Amino acid sequence: MSWLRHKRWIVWSVLAVAGGLLLSGTAEANVLCRLLPMRCTYEGAAFRFTVVDAETRQPLGEVHALAEWQLMGMYSGHGGPLMALDAVSGPDGQITFPAWGPIPGPHLMLGSDPVVTLLKSGYKTLRLANPSPPGTTETTRVRRFGRDGQTIALEPFRGIPDEWVEQLDQVWAGLAMRNQDDNRKFRDPYLNRVRRVWAERDKVPERHRVRPGFFWFVEQEMKRLEGTPK
C-alpha cells in the first residue's frame, strides 16, 4: 500500500469512528476532540452540598457560592469560564446547582470543573477544588462535582480588618480569567458576588475604600458588570 493510500485509509478510518460516535450520542463522542481539530462537548451534572458552622455544626444560610467550570488557558494555565453559576444557601444550609449543557468548548481544567468559592459575612472564605473521579480527563464529557452530597464547614472569622480584606481578595471576582464576552454571558453570577463583597466595605479602614485600595477596584468591576448588557 502506497503512503498516500495508507494516509487516506487512516483518515477514512478516523472519520468512520467519528461518525459512529456522533450518531450514538454517547459521552464517548468526546474522544473525537482528541483526534480531530474540533471542540469537545461538555455537560455539568447537578450537585448539592450543605454548609455548616465549623464550631457549632449548625447550618448556615446566606452563603454565596460561585461555581466556575474553567477552560484550559495558554501554556496549560487557567483560562476563562465555559460555565458560571451561583447559588445562595437557605436556612438549612443547602446549596444546589442545576445540570447544564451540552455546550461545546476547548479542554476543561481538571480540578476546576467546577471550582466553587464560598462567601459569607463573618466567616473565612473558602475555595473548593473538584476532586475529579478516577479516569476523568480534560475531555471527559459529563463533569461531576466530587463533593456532591457532602457537608462543608466554614470557620468564623475573628481577624483584623486588613485580614478580612485579604479574605475577600481571594474570592471577590471569581477565579476564571474573563473577557467581555464572558461578562455578558455570565453577568449575573459574577455581579452577585461582587455586590456581596462591596457590601463589606464599611468594615475596613478608609484606605481600602479609596484609590488604589481594594474596594476601589471592587467598585470599578461592579460598575463595569452593571453596564454590561446581557
What are these model-derived regions, one by one?
Residues 17-22:
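Hydrophobic core
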Residues 30-40, 133-170:
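Extracellular beta-sheet/turn segments enriched in Thr/Pro/Gly and aliphatic residues
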Residues 104-135:
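A short, solvent-exposed loop/turn motif at the edges and junctions
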Residues 55-74, 175-180:
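Short, ordered, surface-exposed loop/turn motifs in non-cytosolic proteins
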Residues 38-40, 75-78, 105-109:
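Short consensus segments that form the blades of beta-propeller domains
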Residues 73-100:
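Short, acidic Ser/Thr/Gly-rich low-complexity loop/linker segments typical of extracellular
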